[in-house]
Amino acid sequence: MPVVSFSRREMERLWRSLSEEELTDLLDFTKMNLESFGEEVGFEVTSDRMDLVTLEGIVRCLKGISNEELGLPKYRVRRKAFEVRVGEGVAKVRPYVVAALVRDVDLRTEESLVALIEAQEKIHDTLGRKRRRVAIGLHDFSKVKPPIIYDARRAEEVHFVPLGEYAEMSAKEILEQTEKGKIYSHLIANPENLVPLIMDSREEVLSMPPIINSELTRLTPGVRDIFIDVTGTDLKAIWYALEIISSALAERGGEISTLDILYPDGRNIETPRHEPEEMEVDLDFIRSILGLNLSEDDVVMQLLRARLDAECSDGKVRVLIPGYRSDFLHPIDVAEEVSITLGLNKIGYELPKNVMTVGRPHPVEKVSRKVRTVMIGLGYQEVLNYIMTSRASLFHAVGREEREVVEISNPVSESYSVLRDALFPGLLAFLANNTHVRYPQKVFEIGDVVLIDERLENKTRDERRVAAAYADDSVGFEDIYSHLKVLFENLSYRIELEPRKERPFIEGRCASVLREGEEVGVIGEIDPEVLLNLGITVPVAIFEVALKVPGKEPLT
């Protein structure tokens, strides 16, 4: 879980002085733990509460728990200060941007700026997936002339002074010579050598996301007006990050100005969102989940202490949720919030009655452990991907033919809208994200896929599989087959291969894997065209096999 630390003096300036014991007692009613207490105060926060990686978010939360401020924070908001115009050039490089302006912020101390940068970098590393998914730019607005332009230019044609430098450099030089450029340049690598840029109306470069800001808009203590840009590959994620940062600055007295983001396809969105979302939950549901006969007033008070707005009538609890909270997906989350602010120690427990069982590993788990040991022995590194993914990632990105898969009826994000029916697309995505790492690269995953099966009552079944991908400049079918053969020999099974024609494999270099005459998987070399589309410049061979075949026992 993320750990953040801030100046205790700055925390006291934002709120009040607390002893270590007082702070620990307050944190018992939050999703935070105290990691350290001295000149710096360290907090461990849960990954679903990214608003708590900001010092301002922590103070906002503690004010609620101590009953000093209840309900939704009231921020000053001015709508549509100016436009951010998105060019067509960024579509294939870094397609999404949102932005805000926050005026009259109190950032008079060095510690306040350090706290802001600490939160920014923690969001980059977690929610932002090391800046791939989300990158935040913070700028001194007094140096900016709106409207703002977000577009791409050829790297050799762009020149500006990068943050922390004294001389003008080309974007190409920044990517090749600066520390940040060397670390993050792979995130915007593309055949056209384009770089995304945040510019003002004079075409002065403010930022080259996700690499580095310009020295022109450096933040210094005493800065009053801050322009925030957030770019990335996931619109929902960057919107969430903007809500976190803009609300944190509003906690320092700032006035949030929303901006119009004009996309080239005609979309016009206003950011940040200044209206809370609403969720309605049955009061009896909360009572049953917590096992407590709470009154309407009890439930409403706990939600107000959680810095939410709430009211209850006719057995329904109506909750208003601010934009910087993305952890409310289901009524169970409202019940959880009540339990946290109420105090988990107030919820009793009892041991199950008449339960006399002896546990043992499931056969599929036993074989999974054995497979893991063999794969590690073959020099492979294990990766873990989500079972939820998108159609684009599962089919389009890796050149697979579309087929019927289990879809989520109301997905929170397009990135998690279907259940995977194969493991290897996730491995290819992993390789595509790590082209900057030295080869050979050998990765594997053991996990479940979900398949349509009309014979079953629920029309689906889970299947445990292992998939492996081997990437190197001279890797071929024979290399990956030798590893598959070793794996099955260690499982005391013989396998046979049968020619197969299927995308995204090279024709003639793909086969079905048969165990006792029944197909259990696939092996082959990936089509170079698919690899190039993913940005992978070396050959890749993969296999994927089931560890449990319907009607047969697990491989043991």
UniProtKB/Swiss-Prot annotation:
Q: Which cysteines are joined by disulfide bonds?
A: none
Q: Which InterPro entries match?
A: aa-tRNA-synth_II/BPL/LPL, B3/B4_tRNA-bd, DNA-bd_dom_put_sf, Phe-tRNA-ligase_IIc_bsu, Phe-tRNA-synth_IIc_bsu_arc_euk, Phe-tRNA_synthase-like_B3/B4, Phe_tRNA_ligase_beta2_arc, PheRS_beta_core
Annotated binding of Mg(2+), by residue: 327, 333, 336-337
Give the protein's cofactors: Mg(2+)
Pfam families the record matches = B5, tRNA_synthFbeta
Q: Which residues form the B5 domain?
A: 274-349
Provide the catalytic activity annotation: tRNA(Phe) + L-phenylalanine + ATP = L-phenylalanyl-tRNA(Phe) + AMP + diphosphate + H(+)
Q: Which NCBIfam families match?
A: pheT_arch
Similarity comment: family membership:
Belongs to the phenylalanyl-tRNA synthetase beta subunit family. Type 2 subfamily.
- Name the record gives this protein: Phenylalanine--tRNA ligase beta subunit
UniProt source species: Korarchaeum cryptofilum (strain OPF8)
